[in-house]
Design a protein with these regions (language model features):
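N-terminal, post-signal-peptide region of Sec/Tat-exported proteins
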Residues: 50-86
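Gram-negative bacterial Sec-dependent N-terminal signal peptides
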Residues: 1-35, 285
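Extracytoplasmic metal-acquisition and chelation regions
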Residues: 132
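Gram-negative and organellar
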Residues: 40, 69, 73-79, 84, ...
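Short N-terminal segments immediately surrounding and downstream of signal-peptide cleavage
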Residues: 35-49
Length: 820
């Protein structure tokens, strides 16, 4: 053996061990370095450097097969970054061939939930719980995912059972979340309060508390909770603005609730307007707050409506409409504003559009009345009636309230009955309206509003004393009710209780100046205080009767002063009559003046006149008086020197007459009345004239726009002398059954346009002359405007016998009553 060889064989084991050690330490160092780099990637990822880690994993996955731990970290890091689609891709790539730990399953389950893929998310949470039944995070994920998936029943069962076992802050919080999703907002509020009891300093809980308060419409505390729960460095501008809007909207809702005291009824609305003003000033210049600014403008409409700033509501609505759609609740406010401003067509158009978009709102809108009145005041009476009937059929008399074992009376049912009463009145069916109103009032004697509605019906039927008695009786329930005082004021106007009218109107106008019914009362009082002009005239077009002559002209005008000292008015006027008779033309001129007195149950006029006629002139006078015994009976008396009904042909021939008369009227209601008249005239030529008449009115037919009355009349007269220079039948009897038709052509609140038709056919008997038929036909039109103008024009054709010969008379007449 050589040295070399022998030496070499001795060195080989030493070299081998040395080389082995060098290789080991070199490999260990590289492993340690690799592990250190990996840990740094994970730590940096947790601190926000996501892209470096994900890039490394992506590169490594192309070069080699990743380990289960690496896949898990890759899933979790992408989950931290919110890259749910990437998490899903990685999971679906590795899970079929690799057994991954629970953190990987949790990361994938969260991403599936975020991607709204409920079924795989629920399956993954369930797998985690199968492996680790006590994994609380996985149970939370399962509960919340089930709730998001709409499986609220199962989610509630799991959350409730867990909170019973372990009532922690987080468990109560998650139960509140599930209850909120399930629509159990009250329960969710209770649960979040329990959570805060366990962790009162947890600001994140206050965030959830704010959200749940908001979902329960407890807006102001929700805003406070958000303020108290703000986390450092967390941007909450959008959520803050939302809470600010909700708190202001809550004030608007409260503003619509009637306040317990008059002085406070606008306090809440004013607070809402002030709050909106501050918010809008703050958000106006911020582009990010553009949507919130518009939302504030929309909700502000409700506060403006409560404050009766109707023009502003309309103006702001039109401005908002140019910028986009407006939610239905705000459009309903706008409809109310249009209705208040007496623009019912606009209100109906808006509400019809709201109902068309959401038919489920129809019944609710109908119950509130605006839709009904917008249709009714647009003169679509049948449609309004149908609406009230349909709403009544769907509104029960009693309703159930959560938490009560018994049913309670339904206020909506009463409101619908009010609408039904109004529809019956609009149909001119006052008896049915009275029966319904009495049934409501008599079954609720302690309800002042029901009795006020009944009094309103009584007043509409011409029974002010009956209405007064009823209103006085219910005054004890709420003496200062402005609705009560308003109707008492209207009743006082009908009863000529002028001082009472003044006091009630002053009080209601001071307290509720913007209420529509109060403004109506104030308007009627204003009209009462105006001067009044009355003009009436007639022109014969074709006549050959001995009473009218030919080409006859009549005109009479009188001007009344405004009332003074409550009861008094002075008046002055004149008249002109002229006609052609067989013995020449006759002319009669009158100037007159006097005083009028009105008081409760009494009316009187005293007049002095200067009359120029025939062969000279003379001084005349008149006293007229009437007394209302009650709502049904009235008696009247009058006495005249140079009575106005003296035939014009008699005056032409120097024959004058004095007269006296009276009448008794019985008026049951607007549907029936009868009157008996008598008059006696003493002529200067010795003739004595006596006349008696009985006339009546019986309602035959009524509808919203058409009224037909049967108006029979019976006249009897006698004169003591014959062969006078004027028509003077010795005795006569006239019977004339007739119909009077009143057709409403147009109506818009206090503006009305009617056409009137009269037709009659009867018989006339005259002593010492043959009997003959009476035929009568008339057509006219009448306009009433704004409570101050009432004027009409008509054409009449009449044909009847005079001394046995039938003569005709065609004339055109007009009348005007104007207050200014």
């Amino acid at each position: 053996m050589s040295f070399v060889n022998s030496h070499s064989s001795r060195l080989n084991p030493i070299l081998f061990n040395l080389l082995k050690s060098l290789v080991y330490f070199s490999f260990s160092g590289s492993v340690v370095a690799a592990e250190s780099h990996y840990d740094t990637l994970i730590i940096n990822a947790r601190q926000g450097d996501i892209s470096t880690a994900t890039s490394w994993f992506d590169g490594q996955s192309r070069n080699r097969v990743l380990t289960a731990a690496e896949v898990t970290d890759w899933l979790q890091i992408n989950g931290w970054a919110g890259k749910d689609a990437e998490v899903r891709r990685i999971w679906e790539a590795y899970s079929p061939t690799m057994s991954l730990p629970d953190p990987a399953l949790r990361a994938a389950a969260k991403s599936y939930r975020n991607l709204r893929q409920w079924q795989p998310s629920v399956a993954l949470w369930s797998r985690v719980l199968q492996r680790s039944p006590r994994d609380d995070d996985a149970r939370s994920g399962l509960i919340l995912t089930l709730a998001d998936a709409g499986q609220t029943k199962t989610a509630l069962e799991l959350a409730e059972s867990r909170v019973k076992r372990e009532p922690t802050a987080n468990h109560w919080r998650e139960l509140a979340w599930v209850q909120r999703i399930a629509g159990k907002h009250t329960d969710s509020l209770f649960s979040i309060i329990q959570a805060m009891r366990y962790a009162p300093q947890d600001k994140a809980l206050r965030y959830d508390y704010s959200d749940i308060l908001s979902s329960n419409n407890v807006s102001a505390p929700a805003l406070n909770a958000l303020e108290n729960g703000k986390l450092h460095g967390v941007q909450t501008d959008e959520r803050q603005r939302q809470r600010e809007l909700e708190a202001a909207a809550e004030l608007v809702r409260l503003a619509f609730i009637a306040s317990t005291t008059e002085n406070e009824r606008f306090v809440v609305a004013d607070r809402a307007l002030a709050r909106y003003s501050a918010l809008m000033n703050q958000w106006r210049t911020h582009p990010s707050a553009k949507a919130s600014y518009r939302h504030a403008r929309i909700d502000r409409l409700g506060a403006l409506l409560v404050r009766y700033r109707m023009e502003e509501v309309i103006s702001e609505y039109q401005s908002l409409l140019k910028e986009g759609d407006i939610p239905s609740y705000a459009r309903r406010w706008v409809a109310s504003a249009y209705l208040y401003l007496q623009q019912p067509e606009q209100a109906e158009q808006i509400l019809s559009a709201v109902i068309q978009e959401d038919p489920s709102q129809r019944l609710q809108i109908a119950r509130q009345g605006d839709f009904f009145y917008s249709i009714l005041e647009s003169e679509k009476v049948e449609q309004a009636t149908q609406l009230s009937v349909q709403a009544g059929e769907k509104t029960p008399y009693k309703k159930s309230v959560y938490g009560l074992s018994t049913f309670i009376p339904n206020d909506d049912w009463v409101d619908i009955k009010y609408l039904r009463i109004q529809s019956l009145i609009s149909h001119n069916d006052f008896p049915a309206a009275q029966r319904l109103a009495e049934r409501l009032a008599f079954t609720g004697p302690g309800n002042q509003e029901l009795n006020i509605r009944l009094a309103e019906v009584y007043l509409s039927r011409g029974w002010p004393r009956r209405a007064e008695t009823l209103l006085k009786r219910v005054e004890l329930l709420e003496p200062r009710s402005f609705r009560l005082e308003t109707h008492q004021g209207l009743t006082a106007l009908e009863l000529q209780e002028w001082r009472q009218l003044e006091q009630l109107t002053d009080d209601t106008v001071t307290r509720y100046p913007d209420d529509f019914s109060v403004k109506r009362l104030a308007r009627l009082r204003q009209v009462h205080h105006m001067a009044e002009l009355r003009i009436a005239g007639a022109q014969g077009l074709k006549s050959d009767s001995p009473t009218k002559g030919m080409n006859d002209t009549e005109i009479d005008a009188v001007l009344y002063s405004p009332p003074f000292a409550d009861h008094w008015r002075v008046f002055s006027g004149g008249s002109f009559n002229q006609s052609d008779f067989s013995d020449g033309q006759a002319t009669h001129r009158t100037l007159r003046g006097g005083v009028e007195f009105t008081d409760r149950d009494h009316w009187a006029e005293a007049e002095l006149s200067h009359r120029n006629f025939g062969l000279g002139s003379d001084i005349g006078g008149r006293l007229s008086y009437r007394h209302d015994v009650n709502d049904f009976w009235r008696v009247g008396l009058n006495a005249e020197r140079l009575m106005r009904s003296t035939p014009l042909q008699a005056l032409k021939n120097g024959v004058t007459a004095n007269g006296a008369g009276g009448y008794v009227r019985w008026r049951q209601s607007e549907r029936r009345s009868w009157q008996a008249d008598l008059s006696h005239g003493w002529f200067s030529d010795g003739n004595r004239r006596q006349e008696y008449a009985l006339s009546g009115q019986e309602r035959v037919f009524s509808s919203p726009s058409l009224v037909i009355d049967f108006t029979p009349s019976l006249s009897v007269g006698a004169n003591s002398q014959q062969n006078t220079p004027y028509y003077n039948p010795r005795k006569y009897v006239a019977v004339l059954p007739a119909l009077a038709i009143d057709h409403l052509l147009y109506r818009h609140y206090q503006t009305e346009w009617h056409q009137e038709i009269t037709a009659g056919a009867g018989r006339y008997w005259q002593k010492d002359a043959s009997a003959g038929a009476i035929t009568q036909l008339g057509y006219g039109q009448r306009v009433r405007w704004n409570d101050v103008l009432d004027t009409g024009v008509s054409v009449q054709w009449d044909k009847r016998p005079y001394d046995g010969k039938r003569e005709q008379n065609v004339s055109l007449s007009f009348d005007l009553n104007y207050r200014f």
